[in-house]
Amino acid sequence: MRNLFKTATIYILIALVILLLVDIFSGGLSYNQFFSNLSERREVIYSELINDINDGKVTRIVLSYNNVSGQYADGTKFDNVFVPSPDKFLDQIQPAIQAKKIQIVTKEPPQVPWWLSTFLPMLIFAGLMIFVWIFMLQQTQGGGSKIMSFTKSRAKTIQDLKKKVTFADVAGADEEKEELKEVIDFLKNPRKYIELGARIPKGILLVGPPGTGKTLLAKAVAGEAGVPFFSISGSDFVEMFVGVGAARVRDLFDQAKRNAPCVVFIDEIDAVGRHRGAGLGGGHDEREQTLNQLLVEMDGFGTNEGIIVMAATNRPDILDPALLRPGRFDRQIVVNVPDAKAREEILKVHARNKPLGEDVDLSQIAKITAGFTGADLENLLNEAALLAARKGKRQINMEEVQEAVAKVLMGPEKRSRVYTEKEKKLTAYHEAGHAIVRTMIPDSEPVHEVSIIPRGYAGGYTMYLPKEDKFYASKSDMMREIVTLLGGRVAEKLVLEDVSTGAASDIKRATKIARDMVTKYGMSDKLGPMTFGTEQEEVFLGRDLALARNYSEEVAAEIDREIKSIIEEAYKKAEEILKQNIDKLHKVANALLEKEKLTGEEFRKLVFEDAQPQLV
């Protein structure tokens, strides 16, 4: 900072000297005038000067175009009196001239050299721009020696083996780790593969939803192999300057070659590897130029250099085909959402440094967190730890974990929100309707928790405990879900003889499931196993998806009738269930009004304490 201030001071002084020289050469201030300003001066206005000259008070004047200076009889000097018109001025002091009371000296204004008036302004402007440019670079990059460093790669290098990440830190991804073991072996023993003529994959693309551990897997590969790990984001290549992205790609691979064997990891590669357009506008953008350089670099080095390029994306469908061909990213590893067993292993990893109570059952937590990614599970245990700390506890109990699950899924509780008794009663019957309908349908997941405490945008919620992870949904599963979603609306109608907007989200989800059954999964008996509507990939828009209708108006009307039929059938089924179990509906709703929240065991005790309920 001190050197920066010193440099700026020098530039400012140089600029001031240049401005002073320009002023001197342009006649604004002569050398003699500059030093004569030290003597006594008198301020005179134009009209007063005319009168003083004609009265004989002025003995000498010097006329230089529109500027008059001179001396009074008492020796007082004046200068820089502006004269609007020199000819008119001479006419006005003609009496004094004729009486020879005054000495007049006429001077031509100093002429500025043509080269000075032409080139000096340009030099000053250029110098000012250079100064501003250097100043900005010093501010952003910390020194004048880094003026051209924006073409350097911004990859972060991880070489500290004491803090390395290994496969022990990556739980629930056994198949993915198995795929990467040969990559690790190649990094450790490349000669074995080279002698056999084997070619290790040059590029490995990790594909999966956000938070599934793609970046963590890449770090584990570098940690297990004990080699340098270069990490960079796809967006770091593209800058405001043309050609910077391609230069950074070249610099990144130059660094990798100097540190081989190593791993180069490009996170969110879809930012730079997006499908190239069709050349609209007669050219290509900076991102495509960067992608072209990346394609060349990946196909330009041999296996004996020991460089493994890994990348991660959650949008493999928009990547350029040239990037996915053999010889570049020729192996794709899908890192999917973990199943129940994998979730339990992930929870064990994240619970290492957390004091868990004896009542915490990680296997049960894994069951109720279907669809959670590794990042979600880590956040879940962190929220549980924060809740325990807020309560002043020294360990995390199952109560905090279950509260954290609901918080992550639907948001924090909003106990301060004020509801009228009518709204509270409506919410209680709505949630009780969901829970009872779900319980009375055969082969349904058991209820885990029912609450009328607001969370997020919801006035209440009903959670279920999945028996097992499902990778496919049958027609009966989807119908069961629609019946459950409509249970809240049916309960409102049966008991309160009115409906509310609280079921809007349920109806929207039920309608979407019914539409997918008809148009996407071919589950309609009338229309048969057909799909309706196509997804168009517009290459001109960078492979953005657009839905196109490929069926007639008659088919569209039939689709609407089928969707309506499914919804009406589910509504009647939910209505039948609740009418047969109306006493249990009242009992659960009253318990919710009293306690606000029921666990799964409390709910089942209320429902099953009498005779066996009617299953529909």
Swiss-Prot record:
The keyword Iron does not apply. The active site is at 431. The keyword Glycoprotein does not apply. GO terms for molecular function: ATP binding; ATP hydrolysis activity; ATP-dependent peptidase activity; metalloendopeptidase activity; zinc ion binding. Its main location: membrane. It holds the Pfam family AAA_lid_3. It is found in: Cell membrane. Zn(2+) binds at residues 430, 434, 506. ATP binds at residues 208-215. Its EC number is 3.4.24.-. InterPro entries: AAA+_ATPase, AAA_lid_3, ATPase_AAA_core, ATPase_AAA_CS, FtsH, P-loop_NTPase, Pept_M41_FtsH_extracell, Peptidase_M41. SUPFAM superfamilies: FtsH protease domain-like (SSF140990), P-loop containing nucleoside triphosphate hydrolases (SSF52540). Residues 1-8, 136-616 are cytoplasmic. It is a multi-pass membrane protein. Keywords: ATP-binding, Cell membrane, Hydrolase, Membrane, Metal-binding, Metalloprotease, Nucleotide-binding, Protease, Transmembrane, Transmembrane helix, Zinc. Its cofactor is Zn(2+). It comes from the Bacteria. GO terms for cellular component: plasma membrane. Residues 30-114 are extracellular. GO terms for biological process: protein catabolic process; proteolysis. Acts as a processive, ATP-dependent zinc metallopeptidase for both cytoplasmic and membrane proteins. Plays a role in the quality control of integral membrane proteins. In the central section; belongs to the AAA ATPase family. NCBIfam families: FtsH_fam. Homohexamer. This is ATP-dependent zinc metalloprotease FtsH. It comes from Caldicellulosiruptor bescii (strain ATCC BAA-1888 / DSM 6725 / KCTC 15123 / Z-1320) (Anaerocellum thermophilum).
